[in-house]
């Protein structure tokens, strides 16, 4: 067995009996920005000791403001970025921090990534049937006839006519292009899709269609999703559990219904209160202040400078992630 990936044969089961197929423990990602003028290295910690789990057949929504580290976590989970320290386990296999491509190869089929911008994700000179077949060509285990049949199957699966296979990306709408990207991600029958702002570039009606498609695919194929988004309404529509990220740290996780109806962390509550209401005249809260610089975070709780409930201890002591019923929350109020 490779010295950069070791097998861990524990069977991770949640209390509800569902297998945990993704686990991160104290996951850290640092970016070295070079030398400080006064000496030493300038290091930006984009992800700070993040612990998450994803169970088989569920969707974990990952929310937070821009720059909170959401996309960085997603890219580490599919091997697009190495992690600095901590632990990643996929299907019971531990991924070493600087694992090479060869170490990731057995997992490539099982974990796929859906990018935010479907236009940028598709080669404009490549017919969409060829684009969808790219993973099949890399795997190289199908005949030409089998490859063509699989492309047709994938296009039907995402709601596109098979006759569209010979068209080019510019001939499609944004929503149709995202369906093509999803079809390509499904080519090798993955078990997990990491969806990084997968509907952010679409209008509201197209967003609803893609969300419904993802839910239908989950029901049909038993997929698990890490659904990364800043739009809380979309996350609510698609997720079973939600994790709230702030300045690279998890501040709260829990079942969708509980977290949306009664958020425990002040940041979770402020984030939900900032969402515009459909009712005319409904009050809307704005989170005061700015997200702290990841190069100079507060000594204690990262949210302390913006928190209306901050106490003295918050300024000096980082709050641990505590289990509160069916949730975890990092706050000195609990």
Swiss-Prot record:
It is found in: Cell inner membrane. Its EC number is 7.4.2.-. It is a peripheral membrane protein. The keyword Nucleotide-binding applies. Pfam families: ABC_tran (PF00005), oligo_HPY (PF08352). Residues 22-272 form the ABC transporter domain. Its main location: membrane. One of its GO terms (cellular component) is plasma membrane. SMART domains: AAA. ATP binds at residues 64-71. It comes from the Bacteria. Keywords: ATP-binding, Cell inner membrane, Cell membrane, Membrane, Nucleotide-binding, Peptide transport, Protein transport, Translocase, Transport. One of its GO terms (biological process) is transmembrane transport. One of its GO terms (molecular function) is ATP binding. It is an enzyme of class 7 (translocase). Belongs to the ABC transporter superfamily. Probably part of an ABC transporter complex that could be involved in peptide import. Probably responsible for energy coupling to the transport system. NCBIfam families: oligo_HPY (TIGR01727). The complex is composed of two ATP-binding proteins (BAB2_1052 and BAB2_1053), two transmembrane proteins (BAB2_1050 and BAB2_1051) and a solute-binding protein (BAB2_1049). This is Putative peptide import ATP-binding protein BAB2_1053. The lineage of its organism: Bacteria, Pseudomonadati, Pseudomonadota, Alphaproteobacteria, Hyphomicrobiales.
């Amino acid at each position: 067995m490779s010295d950069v990936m070791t097998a861990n044969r524990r069977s991770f089961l949640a209390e509800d009996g569902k297998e945990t197929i993704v686990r991160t423990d104290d996951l850290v990602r640092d970016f070295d920005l070079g030398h400080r003028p006064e000496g030493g290295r300038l290091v930006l910690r984009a992800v700070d000791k993040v612990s998450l789990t994803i169970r088989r057949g569920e969707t974990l929504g990952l929310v937070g403001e821009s720059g909170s580290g959401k996309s960085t976590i997603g890219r580490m989970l599919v091997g697009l970025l190495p992690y600095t320290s901590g632990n990643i386990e996929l299907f019971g296999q531990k991924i070493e921090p600087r694992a090479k491509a060869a170490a990731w190869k057995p997992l490539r089929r099982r974990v796929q990534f859906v990018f935010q911008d479907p236009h940028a994700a598709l080669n404009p000179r490549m017919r969409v049937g060829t684009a969808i077949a790219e993973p099949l060509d890399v795997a190289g285990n199908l005949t030409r006839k089998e490859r063509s049949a699989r492309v047709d199957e994938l296009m039907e699966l995402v709601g596109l006519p098979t006759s569209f296979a010979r068209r080019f990306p510019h001939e499609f709408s944004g929503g149709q292009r995202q369906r093509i990207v999803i079809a390509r991600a499904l080519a090798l029958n993955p078990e997990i899709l990491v969806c990084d702002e997968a509907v952010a570039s679409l209008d509201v009606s197209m967003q609803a269609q893609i969300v419904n498609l993802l839910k239908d695919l989950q029901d049909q194929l038993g997929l698990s999703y890490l659904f990364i988004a800043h739009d809380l309404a979309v996350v609510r529509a698609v997720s079973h559990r939600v994790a709230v990220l702030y300045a690279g740290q998890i501040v709260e996780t829990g079942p969708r219904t509980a977290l949306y109806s009664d958020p425990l962390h002040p940041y979770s509550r402020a984030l939900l209160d900032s969402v515009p209401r459909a009712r005319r005249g409904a009050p809307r809260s704005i989170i005061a202040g700015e997200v702290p610089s990841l190069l100079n975070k507060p000594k204690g709780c990262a949210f302390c400078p913006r928190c209306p409930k901050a106490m003295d201890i918050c300024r000096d002591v980082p709050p641990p992630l505590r289990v509160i019923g069916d949730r975890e929350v990092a706050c000195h109020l609990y």
